[in-house]
C-alpha cells in the first residue's frame, strides 16, 4: 500500500523549478522573511538547477571574471537561497491546481497548499535524438552558441549549426567570431530566416551552407570530432569535421502542468504583463525561460526571478496573506557549498545530506540508495 502523502501547512510562496530564475526568486523571498518552498524538479532536465547544470563553462555571468563551471554557479546560488531560509523539496511537481485558493501542488510525497506561486520551470532545448547525442552533450554539442561559443574548446575550430531559421543564422554568424569556419546544416532548399538575415549568412565567406542535409549522428572519442550527414540530392552519406555542434531548432517551454489554467502564446510560453512577471492569474508569477522565448540567458533568468519574488511579496502583503518568520539571528550562518564540504567517512556519512564529498560517500550512495546521483569532478 503506497505511503499516504503528507499535508503541509499553507505556504506563503511556492517556487516550482530551480535554475537561475527559481533560486534567485528564492533568495529575494527568503530575505523578505517569507520562507519560500522551492520544488527543484528532476523530470525535464534530469537534475535540479536548470540548463546551466549541463553547461561546462560559463563566461558571461557577472561576478566571475575568469568564468565558472555551470554546476558550481548553480551550487553557489542554491546555497545562498538555502542560507536565507528557503526550504527545498527535491522532487517533481506532479500536478498543480490553480482553480481555487490556496493553490494546490502535489509532488510524489506531499500535498502542498500555497497562497502564491512562482513558475520557473524553464524551457527545454529541442534535440534530434541521435544515437550518440547524449554522449557528446556538453562535450561538443550545445543548444546555446551565445552561452558556450566563446569557450576555449571551440576557438579556432570548425563548428556547425543545425537549423534554418533566424536563430540558426544568428548563431552561425556569431560563431564566426570564434571558430575557424562554420557549417550551417539546413534540411530544406531554403532558409526560413528573414530575407536580410539570410542574405548576410549566404554572403559570409566563413559560413558554408549545406542545403538539403540531414544530420544522422555525431562521432568522436572523448570530444565531438565529426558529423555524419546525408545529402538528400544525392542520397549519399558524408562526414563533416567539426569540434562543435550547436542546435538551433527551437525550445519547448515546460508548461504542461498549466495547460488550460494560464494564458500562453502559440508556442506554449507563459504570457505575462509587459515587462512584468504577473501571469493571467492573480498571485501567480512566471520567471526565466518559461516566459522568455527570445533572450534565454542565465543572467536574464536571474533578473526575472528577482522581479517575480518582489511582485509576489508585495501582493502577499497587500492582501494580508503573508506570514513572516522571525529570525533568531539577523545574520544567518555561512552557506555550505561543495568547496566547503568535509570529506565523508564512516563516522560522519549521512545519506540524507544533499551534498557529499569523496569516494566513500559515492560508494555508499551508489550501492545502498535509489537516489539519482549527480557527480562533480574537481
Protein language model regions, located:
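Conserved N-terminal Rossmann-fold NAD(P)-binding element of oxidoreductases
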Residues: 16-17, 160-163
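Beta1-alpha1 glycine-rich phosphate/pyrophosphate-binding loop at the start
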Residues: 5, 11-84, 169-195, 265
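FAD-site-proximal beta/loop scaffold in flavoenzymes
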Residues: 2-10, 129, 135-153, 248-300, ...
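Glycine/small-residue-rich loop that forms an oxyanion/phosphate-binding "nest" at active or ligand-binding sites
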Residues: 88-150
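Residue-level detector of alpha-helix initiation sites
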Residues: 19-20, 123-125, 166-167, 292
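A Rossmann-like FAD-binding core segment of flavoenzymes
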Residues: 81-100, 105, 112-113, 176-274, ...
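Proteins that catalyze or organize thiol-disulfide redox chemistry
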Residues: 338-378
